[in-house]
């Protein structure tokens, strides 16, 4: 049996030989440091020096094709033409679930929370060490590989709700409903483990990530939004049940 250290080393080696990373950073010194550091780790790295070029690269099917997609975006917030927050927000609005690591010189809790709330998966404050950036990239890539390796060819059905993982699509009583990326991830997690009770902290870790710095009440807000879209009577929920003193369960 492989030891945990050997398994981790093997997984990191597999990630480095396969992962394709886009770096969108306008400061040449920082961009070159990131690109060179990631290439030394074995990743295939591409870069853009403004938000518009980065967006065009992400939307170019010849560059970001379904059979050879980008695996991670490292995105500065203060970018010319299209800023990082708007780019992140646009990608999530389009249903793009690629992991996004945001870089910023803004270190306040408000700025970090804003970056995560618009769809970033992680937030790293400048100045940072290359070692920490690489470690965060590995963590995001491991999570992405796990998601991709999870069988997604079966439709998940619970009473009147159907979730189609390959299409990131949900129908309720036969009608398609529009969910934000976080709402979709919450519902997918709940439907993967029906009747399991999840605490707010567990939901934060699974959906927002362990580095989330906001209030756990954001879970309650997203649950309320989901109930409004799923339940016949949100005040008497049939699907998303509050388990007082513990958290929430589905069904």
UniProtKB/Swiss-Prot annotation:
Keyword Cell cycle in annotation: no
Response regulatory domain mapped to chain residues: 20-141
Species this chain originates from: Picosynechococcus sp. (strain ATCC 27264 / PCC 7002 / PR-6) (Agmenellum quadruplicatum)
InterPro entries named in the record: CheY-like_superfamily, OmpR/PhoB-type_DNA-bd, Sig_transdc_resp-reg_C-effctor, Sig_transdc_resp-reg_receiver, WalR-like, WH-like_DNA-bd_sf
Signal sequence residues: none
Gene3D superfamilies per record: 3.40.50.2300, 6.10.250.690, Winged helix-like DNA-binding domain superfamily/Winged helix DNA-binding domain
Post-translational events: Phosphorylation.
Protein name (record): Probable transcriptional regulatory protein SYNPCC7002_A0851
Positions of the DNA-binding region: 153-251
Gene Ontology annotations of biological process type: regulation of DNA-templated transcription
Keyword DNA-binding: yes
Gene Ontology molecular functions: phosphorelay response regulator activity; transcription cis-regulatory region binding
Residues with the 4-aspartylphosphate modification: 76
Keywords carried by this UniProt record: DNA-binding, Phosphoprotein, Two-component regulatory system
Pfam name, any one: Trans_reg_C
Gene Ontology CC annotation, any one: cytosol
């Amino acid at each position: 049996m492989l030891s945990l250290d050997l398994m981790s080393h093997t997984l990191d080696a597999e990630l480095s030989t396969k992962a394709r990373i886009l770096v969108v950073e306008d400061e040449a010194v920082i961009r070159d440091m990131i690109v060179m550091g990631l290439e030394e780790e074995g990743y295939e790295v591409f870069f853009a020096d403004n938000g518009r070029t980065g967006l065009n690269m992400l939307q170019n099917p010849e560059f970001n094709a379904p059979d050879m997609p980008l695996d991670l975006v490292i995105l500065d917030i203060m970018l010319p033409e299209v800023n990082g927050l708007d780019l992140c927000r646009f990608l999530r609005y389009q249903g793009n679930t690629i992991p996004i690591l945001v870089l910023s010189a803004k270190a306040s809790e408000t700025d970090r929370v804003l970056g995560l709330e618009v769809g970033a998966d992680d937030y790293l404050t400048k100045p940072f060490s290359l070692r920490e950036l690489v470690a965060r990239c590995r963590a995001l890539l491991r999570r992405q590989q796990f998601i991709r390796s999870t069988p997604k060819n079966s439709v998940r059905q619970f009473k009147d709700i159907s979730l189609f993982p390959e299409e990131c699509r949900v129908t309720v009583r036969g009608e398609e409903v529009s969910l934000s990326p976080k709402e979709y991830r919450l519902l997918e997690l709940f439907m993967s483990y029906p009747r399991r009770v999840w605490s707010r902290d567990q939901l934060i870790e699974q959906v927002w990530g362990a580095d989330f710095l906001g209030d756990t009440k954001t879970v309650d807000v997203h649950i309320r939004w989901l109930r409004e879209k799923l339940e016949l009577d949100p005040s008497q929920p049939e699907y998303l049940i509050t388990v007082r003193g513990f958290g929430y369960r589905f069904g």
